[in-house]
Amino acid sequence: MSEGSKERSAPNPSLPVLKKAAAWLDSIFMDHAFFRFAWHNWHEVVPGRLYRSNHPTPARLARLVKRYGIRTIINLRGERPYSGRQSGTNLLSEAAAAKLGVVHIYAPFESRGAPHRDRILRLAEIYRTMAEPALIHCKSGADRTGLAAGLFILINGGSSEAALRQLSWRFLHVRNSATGVLDAFFHLYAQSGEGRLPFLEWVANEYDEEALRRAFQPGGVTRTLTEWLLARE
């Protein structure tokens, strides 16, 4: 299993005091976790099966497990989202999940690149085998989380129209920017595969991520807003 895509079930859920303090400092000041103390971007994808949010704090994760019975967490950011540097937010999440008895899985995606075929197929396998209900999250819960939510819908027989609804302003997704390549992916399936091939068969045999990457042209002003002010990963 590749780096950044591991399933975690730590035998010792406790972080040493100094390491925990350092993780919190990194999470709050480097990962902007202070925004997520009050803002959660929490939504149901399929009630009782899949939920979505921004990256939850350990305390919020505990509340979600208690209220919704979350059994699996899928972290779409990857194990080391900052140029190979370990994330304090991830360390806290791993420890919290282990303490709560919840499976924690890394399944990284990009917010501004054409979705990779191998990552889509791996996520499909995770969805097939995971304990439900599950929570998917990235940093803000807008772009990669919207993609993963749409993939869940298509994998389970839903339409591209329903998948696209998971990428909207409602979740703070800006399609007229570089992150609009995720919308373009669903539109591509709608135009070239839907009604003719099951979604995963289309992904495995016909989807050309390089062609999508070359063809996609993001907006200008909105792209700048998204990439600089919102600091998309």
PLM region spans:
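Catalytic domains of cell-wall/extracellular-matrix polysaccharide-remodeling enzymes
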Residues: 144
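Cys-dependent protein tyrosine phosphatase-like superfamily
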Residues: 1-134, 147-233
